[in-house]
Amino acid sequence: MARRKRICRFTAEGVKEIDYKDLETLKAYITEVGKIVPARITGTNVFYQRQLATAVKRARFLALLPYTDQH
């Protein structure tokens, strides 16, 4: 069974830089437990996956996103 190749959302939209203040976008790329979803699942290319990880970590540090889920 051949799987369909996932396309990078950020490349398709022509995004220059991922902003750590854009919480709606960042929440789409973290799991319920708070982990960053890997690129092989989302289809995000390497350039944007690095920016995404940095943005999520920055947002966590500034308490915009939680590190883990609510217990």
Curated annotation (Swiss-Prot):
Q: Which UniProt keywords apply?
A: Ribonucleoprotein, Ribosomal protein, RNA-binding, rRNA-binding
Q: Name one GO molecular function term.
A: small ribosomal subunit rRNA binding
Q: Which InterPro entries match?
A: Ribosomal_bS18, Ribosomal_bS18_CS, Ribosomal_bS18_sf
Query: What Pfam families would the database entry show?
Result: Ribosomal_S18
* Single biological process term from Gene Ontology: translation
Q: SUPFAM superfamilies from the entry?
A: Ribosomal protein S18 (SSF46911)
GO CC, one annotated term: cytosolic small ribosomal subunit
List the coiled-coil residues. Answer: none
Asked if the Swiss-Prot or TrEMBL record annotates the protein with the keyword Ribonucleoprotein, the reply is: yes
Query: Which family would the database say this protein is a member of?
Result: Belongs to the bacterial ribosomal protein bS18 family.
NCBIfam families found in the cross-reference section: S18
How does it associate, per the subunit comment?
A: Part of the 30S ribosomal subunit. Forms a tight heterodimer with protein bS6.
Q: Which purpose does this protein serve, as stated in its record? A: Binds as a heterodimer with protein bS6 to the central domain of the 16S rRNA, where it helps stabilize the platform of the 30S subunit.
Database matches in HAMAP family: Ribosomal_bS18
Name of the featured protein: Small ribosomal subunit protein bS18
